[in-house]
């Protein structure tokens, strides 16, 4: 493995003022930044504050664990790709588990002595990445066990929340692999912490939507249709937010936001607003993060407020991790 640092500088990527075919790199950046922007929007909404503030100055905004878990998913994939690009076979799922253990350590938690203690990487040293608010309970409890959950041996077959769903976008951003492998990576990573199919299937559906937009270049209708074999996500009817219900809220937000001929940034804002309205109580950050990821994968950085392309803090770290993934997948 060559290094643990994102390749390239963290200066803002150029905006695209005129519509046209989007490059893969722009869709990756748009997806990851859009997810973080949606997360910040949902956090403000959940706190009873004006969520539009998330779209003006993102440098010091709070985010939930949706953003940090997504970035640690990227880092786990980047580490596996670093090994592979150096000619060394690596277990992608093990790399992701180690990344999530590092995320757990970042939350101030301490796995049991028998758990691996992976060394810090570049992401762990970034003080600008604030500890995510309200870390997913199922994720924390599974990682605190010190055991590596698998699809055949789940740690908790009852864990059906959205903790695996919210971190699954990066699997849809890896090019040059078949869709079946992207789905396998998503499901194996979801099973590290969530044992119920109600949690893992929506994660695969979401990464499939992201892949259809960012890799396959489908339009929104085609991307949503490409995951139709798993069935449309259903709205929440239980007291606790579910993965399927939260994905349903995000998709409804995106459909509402794109129902107009407005510019991409306005569609982005509308999608976030509708997603948090449709979400179950307490699920606003996750639903808005998912909607933001879809909109970013669809429109690239055209969807984002300009501040996200130049701001310090969390957006700068997201940009760096996006470029690290791009570097390892394309050599650019």
Positions of the model-derived regions?
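Structured, active/binding-site neighborhoods that engage oxygen-rich ligands
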Residues: 1-332
């Amino acid at each position: 493995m060559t290094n643990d640092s994102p390749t390239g500088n963290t200066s803002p990527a150029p905006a695209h003022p005129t519509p046209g075919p989007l490059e893969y790199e722009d869709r990756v950046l748009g997806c990851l930044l859009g997810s973080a922007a949606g997360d910040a929007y949902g956090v403000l909404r959940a706190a009873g504050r004006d969520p539009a503030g998330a779209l003006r100055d993102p440098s010091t905004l709070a985010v939930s664990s949706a953003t940090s878990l997504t970035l640690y998913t990227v880092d786990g994939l980047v580490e596996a790709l670093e090994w592979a690009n150096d000619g060394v076979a690596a277990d992608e799922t093990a790399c992701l588990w180690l990344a999530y253990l590092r995320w757990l350590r970042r939350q101030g938690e301490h796995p049991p002595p028998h758990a691996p203690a992976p060394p810090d990487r570049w992401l762990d040293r970034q003080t600008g990445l604030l500890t995510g608010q309200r870390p997913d309970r199922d994720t924390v409890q599974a990682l605190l066990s010190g055991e590596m959950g698998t699809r055949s041996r789940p740690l908790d077959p009852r864990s059906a929340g959205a903790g695996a769903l919210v971190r699954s976008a990066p699997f849809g951003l890896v090019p040059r692999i078949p869709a079946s492998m992207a789905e396998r990576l998503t499901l194996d990573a979801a099973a590290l912490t969530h044992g119920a199919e109600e949690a893992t299937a929506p994660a695969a559906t979401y990464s499939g939507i992201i892949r259809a937009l960012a890799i396959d270049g489908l339009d929104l209708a085609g991307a949503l249709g490409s995951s139709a074999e798993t069935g449309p996500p259903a709205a929440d009817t239980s007291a606790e937010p579910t993965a399927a219900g939260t994905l349903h809220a995000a998709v409804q937000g995106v459909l509402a936001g794109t129902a107009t001929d407005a510019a991409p940034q306005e569609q982005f804002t509308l999608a976030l607003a509708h997603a948090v309205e449709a979400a179950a109580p307490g699920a606003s950050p996750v639903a808005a993060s998912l909607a933001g990821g879809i909109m970013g994968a669809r429109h690239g950085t055209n969807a984002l407020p300009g501040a996200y392309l130049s701001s310090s803090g969390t957006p700068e770290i997201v940009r760096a991790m996006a470029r690290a993934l791009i570097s390892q997948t394309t050599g650019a």
